[in-house]
């Protein structure tokens, strides 16, 4: 057991190693463990209080970056064993973009977005500036483009089929030179492409818009690049590209939608796009699945649950082909939330079947029509990572309630499925945090309660559980394990009341 002064903002694992990182964002300290969390020590590099952001390289298992609020930062290329400092012309952006963007095949090609500010007598005015490095900041970063909203390598994922000749292409949302000194006007925001790190640039042309402006955002999903544009009539249009050259407008069925107002791109089937669309005119919130081109969509399921921040109560099962779970408002009763599951990439959805027996082996009363097993999903997440985080195909675990609606979290129980959600059984009364280790061979759970002094683990997919006593009672916060789920160890982070702080374990 190790004591920390504050809860971790991040617990990150270096893939294929025993190295774990604990980022205390309150005190600005990064701790490192080389033995899967058994022992910890502050890293040697940044002074205490400097570690503002910790960023793992998504494509290089050995690289990570620590960004401060100033212009001196730190990098490692050996999983945090040693750190080297580097400088940038400006502090990291705090506006919209993420400060670092990584190339998936050239791991030392990195874009950095910084924030340049001027101060006059009345206010501080800031704008974002993009820089690039092709050697992982061993040498100074070079200017890319001034007054940007965001910049990305066009090959945003390994799956995006950018031609070899365009490997160095960068896409930026930015303003025309004529607009660069004026007030930030997002209606004039354009997308620019450059194949020579913005020595030259050209405005991106869309399928039905030769001179598009009003870009709202851009991003990616597996093999697709996506851009959203606000049209002159206030309609939000979605455009899709698979090669960073040709952009085609996404088409949704007009018999369902009259005016698309908000898009949420979801992690979905491998060769399709999953997009939740909110249409203000019809008050429809629905999940749409594309064909293999990513441009022609059909309604998969309506009345999806959307949070105030636009997050959809949906999760795609990464290691189970075609399987996803979504929460929806019950027909005719929006206050009732129910859960649906698909096993065919959204072509059809069904209720989740409730267990026939409770924890004591007694028959449940949920054998009547309309009675199912609604589950808590993303909007009620009380742990790090996926809500159903199994790297073992077929195994799912979640918190829910039996009945015709999802009950409040404190009234829910904990359930498991070992056949990709076709059948479920109760494994604990009350909500529990849980994690999978050893590729599903080890399950660990802890009651989500104000104070616990035990955890439970199972080596037989939840059929039997062994109780493990904790050295002292804690309030559990997070239980996590190595992302690939192969390790036998898991970490439980919790707290106890102290005079000045919480102790974390």
How would you describe each model-predicted region?
Residues 1-505:
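Extracellular glycan-interacting surfaces
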